[in-house]
From Swiss-Prot:
Cysteine pairings via disulfide bonds: none
Cofactor or coenzyme needed: Mg(2+)
PANTHER family: CELLULOSE SYNTHASE CATALYTIC SUBUNIT A [UDP-FORMING]
Domain of life: Bacteria
Matching Pfam families: Glyco_tranf_2_3 (PF13641)
Function: Glucosyltransferase involved in the biosynthesis of the non-bilayer-forming membrane lipid beta-monoglucosyldiacylglycerol which contributes to regulate the properties and stability of the membrane. Catalyzes the transfer of a glucosyl residue from UDP-Glc to diacylglycerol (DAG) acceptor to form the corresponding beta-glucosyl-DAG (1,2-diacyl-3-O-(beta-D-glucopyranosyl)-sn-glycerol). It can only use UDP-Glc as sugar donor. Two types of DAG (dipalmitoyl-DAG (DPDAG) and 1-oleoyl-2-palmitoyl-DAG (OPDAG)) can be used as sugar acceptors, but OPDAG is preferred.
Name of the protein this chain belongs to: Beta-monoglucosyldiacylglycerol synthase
Major place of residence: membrane
Keywords tagged on the record: Carbohydrate metabolism, Glycerol metabolism, Glycosyltransferase, Lipid biosynthesis, Lipid metabolism, Magnesium, Membrane, Transferase, Transmembrane, Transmembrane helix
Amino acid sequence: MPQFPWKDNDAELSPLEAFLAEWDDPEAEEEDFRNDFFRGSEGRRKKAAVMLMAIWTVVITLHYWVWGSWLVWALTGALSLQALRLMKATPEEAPPLLTGDASTVPYPQVCLMVAAKNEEAVIGKIVQQLCSLDYPGDRHEVWIVDDNSTDRTPAILDQLRQQYPQLKVVRRGAGASGGKSGALNEVLAQTQGDIVGVFDADANVPKDLLRRVVPYFASPTFGALQVRKAIANEAVNFWTRGQGAEMALDAYFQQQRIVTGGIGELRGNGQFVARQALDAVGGWNEQTITDDLDLTIRLHLHQWKVGILVNPPVEEEGVTTAIALWHQRNRWAEGGYQRYLDYWRWICTQPMGWKKKLDLFSFLLMQYLLPTAAVPDLLMALWQRRFPLLTPLSYLAIGFSCWGMYYGLKRLTPSEGESPWQQMPALLARTIGGTIYMFHWLIIMPAVTARMAFRPKRLKWVKTVHGAATEDALELKQS
């Protein structure tokens, strides 16, 4: 794997070089540069402000430039070719299920980790599922990091530890820092797994998941795998149904991007990372609010492959109200945008390959920059009494999203003896509903990019309320 500025290369210095380095240490300068520019909310806010001003300046200039509309159409054409590449690609097939007895088949050691804070409603279920997976008991361990819970989570974990010998519990104090990333980093050095899996406390984990995940890591360049996420309570209301369609769209894009040489991304819940890859990139970043997306970029910068397992999925509870969705998506949007601000220089200079860089640029433009640029574009259109200049790009983004959602849902919907034509009405209805739901991103992205540029971070995490809290607690108390 390539060497990066933040990796320690002192051992490669000759005595003379080491002496000179004391006077002008490039690594120290690089570290200072990183701390000042690439990390920390102050540096990020400056970069976000510069980026926001650049977006507004470019859009306004295009409106006054005689060739502005032609440039937009040219960019739309180029991105359309990239979209066609993705649409025509055939997804990679999953490797065969790992079978055989542990005495005849080498089973890698797997470590499963859950960072939990006040999760008395679901902690019992996730521990029982992880400790009962169809995988040799002596080849996988379960670590629960209790991040200073104030409810019955510690008591429940004490009972569960007596039932499951592979369960290990670490409790963090009130002064512990780093959030979820800090909790995972704290226990990583104590774990034994060749493969590290991370789950949320509300996850529903299929029993044969490890037998499906482990074969992916046979390749020495395979760094991480994301298990497709599904919404367990999808049928509740419009918001949860929209999240279900959104997950299908995400899985479709992930499959198509990976097979065309683009970027596979981690999604937190249900992610697996090779220990070697995790050590190479320095573990989880404790200065980010979306550790999964940050880790994704660093893995690709080190030229590790990131894949996706579509079936079976890991289920999680979707938020059920617009307010909860707003807070959750604000965090996702900031973290997704923040990684480009943090790592833009390395993305431009490190040898990731042109396919990955093209993929990153395409999705940065369509997913993050276009919604932000739509604000000055609309204002200029109203001022000049003309159609918005970015209309072709907007149509492309919406059309490609509809295509991906339809075929993503189609891949995940069992036929049950129906022909494609018979399935089409229901799939179209779900696609239309999902597309309407997805328009919330057109509000969130401009709001997030503006807030990141001019105001300190004020994100509020809204915890999902799990209805089975009393039931789980009673079951464990009686056992």
